[in-house]
Amino acid sequence: MISVSNVTMRYGSKILFEDVSTQFISGRRYGLTGPNGAGKSTFMKVLTGELEAQKGVVVRPRKLGILRQDQYAFDAYRVIDTVIMGNAPLWAALEERENLYNKAELTDEDGSRLGELEGIVGDENGYEAEADAAILLQGLDIPDSVHERKMSELQGGQKVRVLLAQALFGSPDALLLDEPTNYLDLESVHWLQDFLLAYRGTLITISHDRHFLNAVCTHIADIDYQTIITYNGGYDDMVMQKVSVRTRIESQNEEREKKIEQLNDFIARFSAGTRSSQVNSRKKEVERLATTELARSNIQRPFIRFDMLRPSGKHVLEIEGVTKTYDTPAPDGTTGPVFTPFTCSLLRGDKVILMGRNGTGKTTLIKSLLSGVPDVQDNDFVRTHGDVKWGHEAQIGYFAQDHKAAIQHGTTVAEWLHGFDPKKSTEEIRGILGQMLFRGEEGTKKTDALSGGEAARLLFCKLMMQKPNILILDEPTNHLDLESINALNQSLQKYEGTVLLVTHDQDLIEEVGTRIWHFEHGKVTDHKGPYEEYQQQLAMSAK
């Protein structure tokens, strides 16, 4: 169990949460939610001890499993060792034992200490540590061939999965996971869900994956109104319960403001008259109400709407024998084509979900389709095999997986966006930015200083302004909060153009897609139907 008593955190004059007291009970699985900027990551750091609360006390269990966000902290270590380091007492004992065995001669004191260390290793299941770590890595799709490599040799997505295995290792009393599904493919997300459902300690997770929160969490701890309110059930249950809480709090705010307005009106009308005692009484009442201002919600909802300047022709895309061969081995050591030659055609209005494990070629196929297309092609990428023909009036809007690299540095948010349509007025640019929560002076923010979520929202501004009839989105939900993901989901469902979408977000897969391209075992399978139908087909084939 983790106990929080009277905890307060502020940044300058901004209150994130104040005098929060709550308990996270063993056997329960908590989702920590709230809009961006509400203080989720700050509160998580207070729970782990990385940050000290400005006021209040946090009581933690001895063994915490923590998903660390620093991908480079373990570059000097083997992958398998990085996982084992998740059990700090075991790793300390293993290191000390190795140092003693490396001594030229052992003293009696050293021998006694070795006996103590062997006891610790045994108590912590250290003799099975490498086997247990390997099972975790395999579940997270880190192949055996990588386990002995240094962390510095891995790509970013692989590093995150190793760090997730580190957090899960050693049967911790509590798990604190900040965005555990980032960079996980759908199969790995399902494996993680099953693991967490069987976990018997205390789980606290920050996630912007609604489906994951609904599947895993027994409770939601929501940061809003400068406090933390815990709701029973998953994310959707919390949303329904929060409506009544929000209605009550906002009604109290409205009543308070109306009362202040009435009192000020009385003061203005009678301050020069004979009713001075009544005026003074009302002034005191205004002061009292002003000092007891009720907190307001931090929730901000972006507005995303993808329109088309003009529709494309009926036949949007013809793909003939497309594949890609790299000159150097892939990160897992394999060579040859990423997938067998793929042939397919798309019609106007198709909404295709590209899904499959990481590294199976989804982004490679996207880049192959865009090779040779001005403004959206990757200049460092060359399609090695096959032909691609885009149809009449095809206008492509592209959201790359490395979306921050698509935004020019050394300028402001408004200037960068204005560059794509100089004919638009400053007011029109501000209006588009405002839809994606860049309000007031935020339009003058330097592009170099944008967070991942802000960069994503800025790219959506560009796509809305360009009004393409084909949207190609490669992992657009990374770094978005739940409100932004829900807005994107709704906009893609309403969009009348053609969509190619790489995502591991199950809600997007189920609710947006009308067609599936599944990448598996070096092959791309084209299923002309939604995800639910595809799952039914797979189930029938398995019988």
Question: Which residue ranges define each predicted feature?
Answer:
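ABC ATP-binding cassette signature C-motif
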Residues: 1-251, 306-543
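Conserved short loop/turn motifs at secondary-structure junctions
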Residues: 152, 270-271
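Short low-complexity stretches enriched in small and charged residues
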Residues: 18-22, 273-278
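Intracellular alpha-helical coupling/juxtamembrane segments of multi-pass membrane proteins
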Residues: 241-266, 270, 279-295
